Amino acid sequence: LEEVLKKTNVTQAELDAIVGAEVRQRGPLNWEWVQGILKAIDQHVPLSSGASIAIATKDVYQYLCNAAIANQINDGVMKAMQPGVPTVVVSHSLGTVVAYNLLKNKGSALGWEVPLFVTLGSPLAVTKIKQMITPIGHPACVKKWFNAMDERDIVALYPLSKKYFQVAPQIENKTDVQNPTENRHGISGYLGDPEVARRIHAALT
């Protein structure tokens, strides 16, 4: 990652503004350092944003760039949805991209009804991903959208907030999850959060 950063001409000041000098000095043995470099590349070198996705979210990159892979994944998800049946959709990581893509582009036409759409550890707000799914918007078949992230998660670089992912109605964001998994991205760490679990349970009962 340091080599990638050097090639992008991102300055030390720009990196420090994102991660802070203390985190930078601790180096690559902490996730904040990794996340900071990915954010610096994403924010200051638009043409290199694809590289940051490939490093941190290879599966997402393949889904967006390989039609055969995308079609196979999409078909599996679509078989699980039933028209006219209220369905709570809980998604994580690549799954948030897949779910969003299908809900937005096919949900209404297929008669899907989603009272709650939950995205966990989502990379949807990463610049290159947004460019590849433009135009972005709130899926018409979704009544409420709840997004949760650990700010140290290297895949979920940004919240799905007005600043990074502007849709109407706005998405409710929870950014204080303390994901105990090694890379702060594991799904078990998100589902174990009391508020995340409460939201899902409430929507199902």
What are these regions (language model features)?
Residues 1-17:
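N-terminal accessory alpha/beta regions
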Residues 18-90, 96-205:
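Lipid deacylating catalytic domains
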